[in-house]
A protein has these predicted regions:
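Extracytosolic ligand-binding ectodomains
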Residues: 1-183
Length: 183
């Protein structure tokens, strides 16, 4: 049996703990918003084997821009110890860096108006790597989906470990092209 959790860490941890205590014996798959460093802390042994996707590296993982993120974390939030920092910081950095890049491109192309940021900023990105463990960004006028590369993680012995990155576009090209459309 498999249980899919489409919620945030605290409610998922509670559900997983309860399922474990009741001996329900199901495997658990969680969404991006539940797969973070707090899940094994909150769910304890019940989180063993939980799998989920993440859209970027976890705090401290070996990716090119992580030293800069860690440096700025120490500089601007010195009271927060490293073990309290989470993937959410990396998500925020990723979002800010993507917007910054789009703004630079739009400005260079003639203006920072809303439509220009989309058309001359985001939609000019092709294989743009943020350096934070996420898939390279490619946006077009007709496709604003992620690149299709999704890292899958598992919790083992209280640690979040990368299993593999799945390339959805390569693995299921027909579904990607014809069914999994969206913005």
């Amino acid at each position: 049996d498999v249980v899919w959790h489409g919620n945030t860490t605290m409610s998922v941890a509670s559900t997983i703990r309860d399922a474990y205590a009741l001996g329900l014996g199901a495997d658990h798959i969680v969404n991006n918003w539940a797969m973070d460093e707090n899940l094994p802390k909150l769910a304890g042994k019940a989180s063993e084997g939980v799998m989920g996707a993440a859209m970027c590296a976890f705090y401290g993982e070996d990716v090119p821009l992580m030293p800069k993120v860690v440096e700025y974390g120490k500089k601007y939030n010195p009271g927060v110890p490293r073990e309290k920092r989470t993937v959410r910081a990396i998500q925020a950095w990723s979002n800010a860096l993507a917007l910054w890049e789009a703004l630079k491109r739009a400005d260079k192309a003639g203006g920072l108006g809303g439509e220009n940021i989309l058309k001359k900023g985001f939609e000019t990105m092709k294989g743009f790597d943020l350096g934070l463990g996420g898939a390279p960004l490619t946006y077009t006028a007709t496709d604003h989906r992620i690149s299709g590369q999704v890292p899958i993680y598992v919790i083992k012995e209280g640690k979040i470990m990368l299993v593999e990155a799945i390339d959805l576009k390569a693995r299921w090209p027909q579904k990607w092209a014809n069914e999994w459309l969206g913005w």
